Regions:
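Nucleotidyltransferase catalytic core that binds NTPs
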Residues: 1-90
Length: 90
């Protein structure tokens, strides 16, 4: 494990080339923990989702540099709870 944990949060629905570039840059800085927003968050944001949480988790886990993908309470529209979860875990 690297010295730094880099937190990336988002819906990633679907993961596209811009996301991949972000992951590649983050990987240069440290190990990546992904805070993956819920299906409900995507419905509130976009009205629907393309890939469900489990499918998005599977894709994210297979990106080089990702050491963990976490579900978190995003009911308030923020990633605050997820960040606190990462701090507690790592």
């Amino acid at each position: 494990m690297k010295e730094k944990i880099i937190i990336l949060s988002g819906g990633f629905d679907p993961i596209h080339s811009g996301h991949i570039s972000m992951f590649e840059e983050a990987r240069e800085l440290g190990d990546i923990v992904v805070l993956l927003n819920s299906d409900e968050w995507l419905i509130r944001k976009k009205g629907s989702f393309f890939m469900d949480w489990e499918d998005r988790e599977s894709v994210a886990k297979n990106i080089s540099g990702v050491i963990d993908v976490l579900h978190f309470n995003d009911d308030d529209g923020t990633a605050v709870q997820g960040i606190l979860d990462v701090v507690k875990k790592y």
